[in-house]
Amino acid sequence: MLLYYILVALWATVTYAKSFSEDISEMPELSEMSSYLNQTPEAKDVLDQQKNVTLLALENSAFRDFVGQGEGNDNQSSSNSSLLRGIFSYQLVKGLHNSEQITTTPQFSPTELNDAGFTNVSSGQIVQLVEKDGKDYAISGLNDNSTIIKPGVDVENGVIHVIDRPLTLPQSVTATLQAANLTSFQGALQRGNAVSNANDPKDITLFAPRNLGFQRIGTAFENISAEDLGQIANYHIVKGKVLYSPDLTDADHPTYADKDLHISTVDGRSYVNSARVESTNLLVNNGVIHVISDVLNPNNDTAKPVPNADPPPPAFENANPVSTDPLTDGIPSPTSVIPLPGITSGGEGGGGGGGESTAPPSPTATVTETQSGGGGGGGGGAGGGPGPTATNTPQPGAAATERAKAGLAAVVGLGVVLINA
């Protein structure tokens, strides 16, 4: 008889282990999501199969807004259901990340997003989990900050955090450079025929100089050949390694210019050769971008940091400054610029947006492409119109996407994903 009761108790334990959907149904902040799951058995089944994951779930108003937007774009949503499923996968973080584990030291956590159409990172696309000013955030593509508005709830199959806005899928290198107004380097990649080395390979780290860094040596690009410019651009791309801010320690790394660059730390600040690291951890779909003060020179690969110099000494001798952004002829200028993240590896100060904006990190701004306001060509070139500025207008999930229209990219909530499940 005792054995019978033991078996019954074990059976009950297995039978009544809660699923994700059951846990969600008990959270008032997720009642909209719960209601929709009950109406969408296929989506509910997919979610309930997840184990040992951390779910970043949209709170009610955000969920409701995105469901409404999705229903208003049925034809477009249907044709891009794979994109929406990709966003859903991106909001499922591998492993257990409760509130106590999210600290001021950033975590670069792999997610369930492994679809080769959207990511080319071996571990699965990364989301950054970090505490800032007493609040916890999930930081995604284009430096989009989603606030965790309810501390993580430990449930049977993982952890549930409630967030106030959906994550943004990391974009390609070139789309991200444009959104951040790092357009001189974007121009260097294009004119140097190095775009494929930036956008296509798996697991890269790219050090993008600010536009002001190009201006400081603008005459170096007058009449430069495509081959020489490509060598310079390729020297900024580390092969086969995704180096997040904690990895920016003393070491040499191979680049697509077939020369090593050297990372060093001085007084808690990171340098690449002699260039100062000014912004870190801008996620892209095949790795990460860090912003540096100046252009690296593959023919001066022994350049060393000069910590007391501000600005750092340029790596190009005999080059003179120009007053406009070099290499930006034909590069569309965004009408607004995403604010860049600050330095999270220690050091002093933080990054500004694209070298021109001083706006602090905030919800992703809308990124609109336009042909006006471009900078000059080969050297300083002709001046453009007024430069883009940062805006803090909240546009959850907005992104300058290539695989899907920006309008659809803004309709990126878990709710929309579930519509197409």
UniProtKB/Swiss-Prot annotation:
Pfam families in the cross-refs: Fasciclin
GO cellular component: fungal-type vacuole membrane; plasma membrane; side of membrane
Region (Disordered): 300-401
Known glycosylation sites: N52, N75, N80, N120, N145, N181, N223, N300
GO biological process annotation, one example: macroautophagy
Record's subcellular location: Cell membrane
Biased composition (Low complexity): 388-401
Lipidation (GPI-anchor amidated glycine): G397
Domain FAS1: 18-167, 169-296
Membrane topology, as annotated: Lipid-anchor; GPI-anchor
Family, per entry: Belongs to the fasciclin-like AGP family.
Protein name: Fasciclin-like arabinogalactan protein ARB_02922
